[in-house]
Structures are given as C-alpha cells and as structure tokens.
Amino acid sequence: MPLNKSNIREYKLVVVGGGGVGKSALTIQLTQSHFVDEYDPTIEDSYRKQVVIDDEVSILDILDTAGQEEYSAMREQYMRNGEGFLLVYSITSKSSLDELMTYYQQILRVKDTDYVPIVVVGNKSDLENEKQVSYQDGLNMAKQMNAPFLETSAKQAINVEEAFYTLARLVRDEGGKYNKTLTENDNSKQTSQDTKGSGANSVPRNSGGHRKMSNAANGKNVNSSTTVVNARNASIESKTGLAGNQATNGKTQTDRTNIDNSTGQAGQANAQSANTVNNRVNNNSKAGQVSNAKQARKQQAAPGGNTSEASKSGSGGCCIIS
C-alpha cells in the first residue's frame, strides 16, 4: 500500500523544562543526529521528522519551547495544542527537577484533565561527576506524575530516540485507553445520578478509599442522628415528667380543695345539727315551762273551785244564817 499523508499518523509532541537542561540538544540530536554543544536560549522552534515506530510510519511534530521565565506567557498556548509532553530536567541541577512539578500542574490545568501522556527525562547522564539528582529522585518524580522515566544523554545519543518514541506510543495507546476511560466515567456518572436518592441502596461511584470515607461519613451522620433522637426523647421524657408532676400537683390541690369543701360541709352540717338540737332543747324547755305553768295553775285553781261550787249551791234559794 503506497504511503500518503492520510496514512501517516502525526504526533504533536512538546519538550518542556527549565533553561539550560538540554531540550534543544535532545530535539536536534533526534531530528538531525548531531549534538549542539553551545547554549543558545530558545524562544520556540518546531521540528518535524518521519520515523518508524513499531513498524508504523509516523511523523513527529516536535515543539522545542523556551525555558526562561520571561516566555512563560507562551506556555499555555503550546500546552493547549500538544498531545504529549517530554518533561526534561538536568541531573546536574536539583532545582530543574523541582521545576517539573510546576510544569506538570500547569499542563493538567490547561488541558482540564487528570491524565496527559508524559515522559520524564533526566538529561546529561554523561556528566556523572556533576550529578546532583539521583536516579531514584527522578524516578520518584515520574511516579508522582504516573509517567515513564528515562535518563538520557543528548551528547552521547543515549536513550534519545527511546524517550521520544515512548511518548509517541503513550499518545497512540493511552489516548484511546483514556477516551475509553472517559466514556466509562460518564456512564458511571449517569448510573450514580440514576441511583441518587435511593437511600441505603445507593452505592458510591468510586471504590477503595472513597468508599471507606463515604462509610465513615455515613457513620458520623448516623451517630449524629442518634444523638439528636436521644436528645429529643430526653426532652419529651422531661416534658412528660413535668406534665405528670403538674397533673399530680393539680390532683393534690383538687383533693385538698375537696377535703376542705367536705370539711366545711361537714362543719356546716354539724352546726346545723347542733342548732337543731339546741332548738329542740329550747322547744322542750319551753314546752316544759308551759306544762309546768299549766300544772301550777291547775293546782292553784283547785280550792277556788270548791268555793265556786258552794256559791253555785247557795244561789239555788237556800240561805244558811250563822
């Protein structure tokens, strides 16, 4: 099958790093097969090279960027357009390694994603006597970025092709895998939205540590809810006890009132009974007095009665003269 532009995959690769770490030397060694010894600060250079990667003809479109801070305003534009990034530091400069994290975070922010094809490169491996950064330090930095790591020498052409080819493979392979991951995440988000609000049946979208945290948070909510419920129950019990005490006090007061009323009524009844007895005594006394008076009058009237009888006899026409 004849080659044409439509059959050739093109990779847009960007070389990023601090000033003087050998970005241009690596790019020129790859594209022109020679080493540039003198340092000429780059503003921005673009290189193209046709290569064969895994039996596939490809074109590497490489952007060599400026490492100086005064050109930092240009970074976002090439970060936005790049597909893969070669993050380069010099093994003779510890600060150049530390700078890589700043570039990495800026790339993620500009690309608005949590994955970008990246290869971390420790250049100038031929200057072993001036080494400030160990292989392990470089590897640890690459692990933080979830990226492959290589030490290279642009001067001796060590691992130069391998660094660029590895980056192209990441763009080719991880790009498709990453798109698949995005699709799966979108489906997972939709499933999460569908199950949202289903209470205990809801399952967190993420697993592992996120699930554990969700459970811990749920446990915290449960304890909090239990505390609130207990507080409410305590409040209800307190109010119920208060009402009970008030009812008891009310009943006691009512009983006392009833007792007082009963006592008063009994007193009144006793008083009335006493009055009745007194009245009866008085009546009896009066009756006795009347009876005695009548008896006395009868006794007094007895002699007078005989005289009267005699008078009645004399008045019948018979008169006795003494």
From Swiss-Prot:
Compositional bias of kind Low complexity: 261-284
E.C. code: 3.6.5.2
Any Gene Ontology CC annotation: nucleus
Membrane topology type: Lipid-anchor
Any GO BP annotation: positive regulation of pseudohyphal growth
Main localization category: membrane
Stored Pfam families: Ras
Modification note: Farnesylated by RAM1-RAM2, which is required for targeting RAS2 to the cytoplasmic site of the endoplasmic reticulum, where proteolytic processing of the C-terminus by RCE1 and methylation of the resulting carboxyl group by STE14 occurs.
Glycyl lysine isopeptide (Lys-Gly) (interchain with G-Cter in ubiquitin) crosslink location in chain: K131
Entries under SUPFAM superfamilies matching the protein: P-loop containing nucleoside triphosphate hydrolases
An example Gene Ontology molecular-function term: GTP binding
Alphabetized UniProt keyword annotations: Cell membrane, GTP-binding, Hydrolase, Isopeptide bond, Lipoprotein, Membrane, Methylation, Nucleotide-binding, Palmitate, Phosphoprotein, Prenylation, Ubl conjugation
Motif (Effector region): 39-47
Span list, region Disordered: 178-322
Enzyme class: hydrolase
Reaction(s) catalysed by this chain's protein: GTP + H2O = GDP + phosphate + H(+)
Residues with PTM Cysteine methyl ester: C319
Gene3D superfamilies listed in its UniProt record: P-loop containing nucleotide triphosphate hydrolases
Family (UniProt): Belongs to the small GTPase superfamily. Ras family.
Functional description taken from the UniProt entry: The S.cerevisiae Ras proteins modulate the activity of the adenylate cyclase catalytic subunit and therefore affect the biosynthesis of cyclic-AMP.
Protein name in the entry: Ras-like protein 2
UniProt organism field: Saccharomyces cerevisiae (strain ATCC 204508 / S288c)
Gene name linked to the record: RAS2
